[in-house]
Design a protein with these regions (language model features):
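Intrinsically disordered, low-complexity linker/terminal regions across diverse proteins
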Residues: 1-78, 82-180
Length: 180
């Protein structure tokens, strides 16, 4: 296993090095991805949301999924979260074509950065354990994505009759739970 992993790394490095100085091929599949992986991501260099096929099964998605679970999983946890990365601390620096180019009006960008700074300061005060605290600037992009994804899903929920918020939040919590 280790040898195969090392050879894959060498191949990827050689491929990426060969592409230096060339015009980016926006149709080229990112070579670091595995189609069986359970993941989704926003790629700021081509302004795309990518959902790997491994996540398109239970518990993330199944055909008779109640709308509350669907909104919690695909709405908040996956799609809403990933779309918002286009507008987080990193994504905000890239334009429509994926070029590193600040496209925001100066006043909007300053306001955005002021809000991010306020969030970072709040997060910096959270004790993890003993004398270890969260470093807000290390997690702000993911926090923005989580909060925005949740807001998007809740906005959709407002339009649903008899939406069960308890089911929604329980499923959302399960999507975020981990054992360590």
């Amino acid at each position: 296993y280790y040898e195969a992993l090392a050879e894959t790394g060498k191949y990827n490095t050689k491929l990426e090095t060969s592409l230096l100085g060339t015009v980016p091929d926006r149709e080229m599949w990112a070579n670091s991805l595995c189609v069986l992986e359970c993941n989704a991501f926003y790629n700021n260099t081509d302004n795309s949301i990518n959902m790997i096929v491994g996540m398109m099964g239970s518990p993330f998605y199944y055909s008779d999924m109640p709308v509350e679970e669907l909104y919690a999983s695909l709405g908040a946890f996956w799609i809403g979260h990933e779309i918002s990365h286009a507008f987080d601390s990193n994504g905000a620096q890239y334009d429509l074509e994926g070029n590193l180019n600040n496209w925001w009006p100066e006043e909007d960008y300053a306001g955005f950065n002021a809000r991010v700074k306020k969030m970072d300061e709040y997060l910096d005060g959270i004790l993890i354990m003993d004398d270890y605290y969260v470093n807000g600037s290390n997690v702000d992009s993911e926090m923005i994505a989580d909060m925005t994804g949740l807001q998007c899903a809740l906005k959709m929920a407002e339009k649903e009759e008899n939406f069960d918020y308890a089911v929604f939040f329980e499923y959302y919590a399960r999507m975020n739970a981990s054992v360590s």
